[in-house]
Swiss-Prot record:
CDD domains: HTH_XRE. It comes from Synechococcus elongatus (strain ATCC 33912 / PCC 7942 / FACHB-805). This is Uncharacterized HTH-type transcriptional regulator Synpcc7942_2319. SMART domains: HTH_XRE. Residues 13-68 form the HTH cro/C1-type domain. Belongs to the VapA/VapI family. Keywords: DNA-binding, Transcription, Transcription regulation.
Length: 70
């Protein structure tokens, strides 16, 4: 069955990766080496994911002990 309005990839990253680990957009942006504004636009569905950003997102984020503990 086809989805009529599939979610933006950034929304999926936000909901399935950042939120469950308690990682803020600011923390994730710093770990990825991008501005908070850039990452926020992607996660909120206002910007696409460039090939360079896809490579950055493919790398594991360095987590603090608090984040690893959940």
């Amino acid at each position: 069955m086809l989805m009529h309005n599939p979610p933006h990839p950034g929304e999926i990253i936000k909901e399935l990766c950042l939120e469950p680990l308690g990682i803020s957009i600011t923390e994730a942006a710093a770990a990825l080496g991008v501005s908070r504004k850039t990452l926020s636009a992607i996660l909120n569905g206002h910007a696409g994911i460039s090939p360079e950003m896809a490579i950055r997102l493919d790398s594991p984020l360095p987590l603090t002990p608090r984040q690893r503990a959940g």
